[in-house]
C-alpha cells in the first residue's frame, strides 16, 4: 500500500524551481528517475512532465533516510524540502535545475513500481513493439512528452486562429451513412435496425457542406476520421484532421486563410518563421519538373524531357517509348559518377519497383571520361545534345527512364528522392511549403474501364474546362489544391460543386445510377435544391503536420495510443472477441474461416 497524499499540496513542478527559490520550503511530487546511494547521502532524481530536480537525503534523517534507500526507479513519491544551491563542482549545466537541489525534510512513497521492461529516458534504445505494448511507460519519456505537448500547442493554435478569423467550431456526427470515399468504411451494425449499418466517417465532408447550405459561413473542427485500409508509416485506421469549410470564397481565399494558420502554428509552437505566401504550382508542372504531385522542393534535381532528342536514335528502348506516346526523361545526379556499379544496380532495382522496365545511365568521371549503358546506340551528336540538355559536368550521373508518362514520372520522382537521401542533402530544419493546384478532375481506372474522381465527387471543375466534361473528361482540371511540406501532403481540399444539376451530372459520369446516387447522396442533392452558396475548404492531417514539426519519421510517434501495421493495439489487444450475446443482439453472425 502506498502512503496517502493527505495534507500535502504540490507547490511546484520540478523545473519551475530555480536559484530564485533558494531558501524556500517546497513540496514536489513525481516519478523517481534514478536513486544513488553514496553511504551517508542518497540522491534521487525526481521527474515530472516538466523535467527533473535533484533531491538530497542525509543519514542524519534516520527513518526517512532508510526509506529513501529503499526507493527504486519509477516509484511515485512526494517530498517536502528546502531549495538549496549546489556546490560549484556539483552544478550540472545540462539540467534546467542544475544549479539547485532540494534538501528533503519529509518523504512519502505514494506507490511503488516493478522493474520496468524499458528505460524511461530520452531516445531509449528499445524496439517499437515493446514501446507500444507498454505505451503508458513509453509516454513517460521526455521525447514522447515533447511530441504530445507540441501536438496540444498546434491544436490550440488552430482553435485560436480559426476562432479569430470568424470560424465556428461545430461537431459533426460519428455514426453516419456509409458512402465510401475510396477506402473501406468501418461499419457499425445497428441493434435497433436489424440488417442496417452505420459507418464511421472517413471525413466530415458531406456534413460540412451541409453546414454551408445551412448558412454557417465558416466552419472548423478538429475531427476524428476512420479508414479501414492497409497501414503505412503515415497512415492509421483512426486519425485526426483539422477540418475547414468556407462560404462565398474562391481558391485564393481558401489558400490564404489556411497558410495563415500554418504560419502561426510554426511561429507559436516552434518559434520558426514560415515565409508566405507559399509557392503555387499547377499539378502538370509538378509532374513535369519533379515527377510527383507532392514534390520536395528543398533540392533541385528536376526531370529533363529528352524525348525529342532520342525519338529517332538507335536505342530501341528510347524510340519505342516515344513511339507509343510515352516519353524519355532523365535526372542529373550531381557528383554521383562515383557511385559503384552495385549502387547503380540498386537504383535500377528501385525504379523497377515503380513499374519501370529499367534505368539507363551516363556517368562522367572527373577526367571527363564518359561511360554509359547505351552509348553504343547513340551518335556523337545525339550524346552531346543529351549532355547539354542535362547540363552535365564532370562528376555527374545522368539517370534515364523510358516508358508511359505515368511510369516515368513515378519512377524518376522516387529515384530523385532516393538519391537525395543517399547524398544526405535533405535538411530537416528547412521547411519548404507549396500548394499544388489544378489537379485533374478525373483519373481513368484501367481495371474498371471508367473515369473515377481524382479527389472526390464533390470537387468543382475549373470554369474554363466545363466545356470538356462530355467530350474529353481527362482534360478537365479541378478547383482542387494540396498543401505540401518537404514532399509530404499535409492536407488538401477544393472548391465544391454547389449546383444541384452539376452534382447529379458528376455522379452520373462516375458511374452512379440515378437510384444509387439518390440512395447514397440524396440528402445532399435535396439540400442543393434550396439555395446553396459557393463554398470550398480543406483538411489538414494533424498527425502528419505534428510529425513533420517534431522531425519524426512516423505519425505513431505523435499519437498517444496508435495502432500498429495490422490495425491492432498491442497494449490493449484491441480488436478482440466479444460475448456471443452481444453478437446476437446485433442480429449478425460471424462467418467461419
From Swiss-Prot:
The EC category is: ligase
In this chain, the stretch annotated as Aspartate covers 205-208
Source organism's superkingdom? Bacteria
Pfam families referenced in this protein's UniProt entry, alphabetically: GAD, tRNA-synt_2, tRNA_anti-codon
Binding annotation for L-aspartate: 181, 227, 455, 496
Q: Which GO terms describe its biological process?
A: aspartyl-tRNA aminoacylation
Kindly list the places in or outside the cell where this protein is found, as annotated in its UniProt entry: Cytoplasm
Q: Which UniProt keywords apply?
A: Aminoacyl-tRNA synthetase, ATP-binding, Cytoplasm, Ligase, Nucleotide-binding, Protein biosynthesis
List the Gene Ontology MF annotations in alphabetical order: aspartate-tRNA ligase activity; ATP binding; catalytic activity, acting on a protein; nucleic acid binding; transferase activity
The EC number of this protein is: 6.1.1.12
Kindly list any coiled-coil regions of this protein: none
The UniProt catalytic activity note for this protein reads: tRNA(Asp) + L-aspartate + ATP = L-aspartyl-tRNA(Asp) + AMP + diphosphate
Residues that bind ATP: 227-229, 236, 489, 541-544
The keyword Cytoplasm appears for this protein:
yes
Q: Answer whether the UniProt record assigns the keyword Hydrolase to this protein.
A: no
Q: Which GO terms describe its cellular component?
A: cytoplasm
Q: Which NCBIfam families match?
A: aspS_bact (TIGR00459), PRK00476.1 (NF001750)
Q: How does it assemble?
A: Homodimer.
The similarity annotation says: Belongs to the class-II aminoacyl-tRNA synthetase family. Type 1 subfamily.
Protein function: Catalyzes the attachment of L-aspartate to tRNA(Asp) in a two-step reaction: L-aspartate is first activated by ATP to form Asp-AMP and then transferred to the acceptor end of tRNA(Asp).
Name the record gives this protein: Aspartate--tRNA ligase
In its UniProt entry, the species of origin is given as: Ruminiclostridium cellulolyticum (strain ATCC 35319 / DSM 5812 / JCM 6584 / H10)
Encoding gene, per UniProt annotation: aspS
Amino acid at each position: 500500500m502506498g502512503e496517502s497524499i493527505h495534507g500535502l499540496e504540490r507547490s511546484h513542478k520540478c523545473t519551475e524551481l530555480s536559484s530564485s527559490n533558494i531558501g524556500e520550503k517546497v513540496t514536489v511530487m513525481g516519478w523517481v528517475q534514478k536513486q544513488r546511494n553514496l553511504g551517508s547521502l542518497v540522491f534521487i532524481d525526481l521527474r515530472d512532465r516538466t523535467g527533473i530536480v535533484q533531491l538530497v537525503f542525509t543519514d542524519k534523517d534516520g527513518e526517512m533516510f532508510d526509506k529513501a534507500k529503499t526507493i527504486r526507479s519509477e516509484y511515485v513519491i512526494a517530498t517536502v524540502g528546502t531549495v538549496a544551491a549546489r556546490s560549484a563542482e556539483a552544478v550540472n549545466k545540462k539540467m534546467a535545475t542544475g544549479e539547485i537541489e532540494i534538501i528533503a525534510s519529509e518523504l512519502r512513497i505514494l506507490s511503488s513500481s516493478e522493474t520496468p521492461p524499458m528505460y524511461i529516458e530520452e531516445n531509449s534504445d528499445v524496439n517499437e513493439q515493446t514501446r507500444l505494448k507498454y505505451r503508458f511507460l513509453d509516454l513517460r519519456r521526455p521525447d514522447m512528452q515533447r511530441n504530445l505537448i507540441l501536438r496540444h500547442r498546434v491544436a490550440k493554435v488552430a482553435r485560436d486562429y480559426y476562432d479569430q478569423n470568424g470560424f465556428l467550431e461545430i461537431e459533426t456526427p460519428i455514426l453516419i451513412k456509409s458512402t465510401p470515399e475510396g477506402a473501406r468504411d468501418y461499419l457499425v451494425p445497428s441493434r435497433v435496425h436489424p440488417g442496417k449499418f452505420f459507418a464511421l466517417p472517413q471525413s466530415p465532408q458531406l456534413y460540412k457542406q451541409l453546414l454551408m447550405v445551412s448558412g454557417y459561413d465558416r466552419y472548423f473542427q478538429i475531427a476524428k476520421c476512420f479508414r479501414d485500409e492497409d497501414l503505412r508509416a503515415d497512415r492509421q485506421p483512426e486519425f485526426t484532421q483539422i477540418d475547414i469549410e468556407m462560404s462565398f470564397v474562391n481558391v485564393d481565399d481558401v489558400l490564404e486563410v489556411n497558410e495563415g494558420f500554418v504560419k502561426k502554428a510554426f511561429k507559436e509552437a516552434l518559434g520558426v518563421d514560415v515565409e508566405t505566401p507559399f509557392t503555387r504550382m499547377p499539378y502538370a508542372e509538378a509532374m513535369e519538373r519533379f515527377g510527383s504531385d507532392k514534390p520536395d522542393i528543398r533540392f533541385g534535381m528536376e526531370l529533363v524531357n529528352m524525348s525529342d532528342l532520342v525519338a529517332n536514335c538507335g536505342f530501341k528502348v528510347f524510340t519505342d517509348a516515344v513511339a507509343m506516346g510515352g516519353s524519355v526523361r532523365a535526372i542529373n545526379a550531381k557528383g554521383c559518377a562515383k557511385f559503384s556499379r552495385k549502387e547503380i544496380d540498386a537504383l535500377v532495382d528501385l525504379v523497377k519497383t515503380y513499374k519501370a522496365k529499367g534505368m539507363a545511365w551516363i556517368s562522367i568521371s572527373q577526367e571527363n571520361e564518359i561511360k554509359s549503358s547505351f552509348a553504343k546506340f547513340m551518335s556523337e551528336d545525339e550524346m552531346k545534345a543529351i549532355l547539354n540538355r542535362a547540363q552535365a559536368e564532370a562528376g555527374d550521373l545522368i539517370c534515364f527512364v523510358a516508358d508511359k508518362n505515368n511510369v516515368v514520372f513515378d519512377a524518376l520522382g522516387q529515384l530523385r528522392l532516393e538519391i537525395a537521401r543517399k547524398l544526405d542533402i535533405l535538411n530537416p530544419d528547412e521547411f519548404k511549403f507549396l500548394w499544388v493546384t489544378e489537379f485533374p478532375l478525373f483519373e481513368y481506372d484501367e481495371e474498371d474501364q471508367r473515369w473515377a474522381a481524382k479527389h472526390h465527387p464533390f470537387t468543382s471543375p475549373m470554369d474554363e474546362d466545363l466545356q470538356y466534361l462530355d467530350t474529353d473528361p481527362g482534360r478537365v482540371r479541378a478547383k482542387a489544391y494540396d498543401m505540401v511540406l518537404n514532399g509530404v501532403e499535409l492536407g488538401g481540399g477544393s472548391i465544391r460543386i454547389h449546383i444541384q444539376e452539376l452534382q447529379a451530372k458528376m455522379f452520373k459520369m462516375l458511374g452512379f445510377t440515378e437510384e444509387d446516387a439518390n440512395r447514397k447522396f440524396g440528402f445532399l442533392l435535396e439540400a442543393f435544391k434550396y439555395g446553396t452558396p459557393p463554398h470550398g475548404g480543406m483538411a489538414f492531417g494533424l498527425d502528419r503536420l505534428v510529425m513533420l514539426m517534431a522531425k519524426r519519421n512516423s505519425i505513431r510517434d505523435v499519437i498517444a495510443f496508435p495502432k500498429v501495421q495490422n490495425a491492432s493495439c498491442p497494449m490493449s489487444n484491441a480488436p478482440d472477441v466479444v460475448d456471443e450475446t452481444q453478437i446476437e443482439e446485433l442480429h449478425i453472425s460471424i462467418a467461419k474461416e
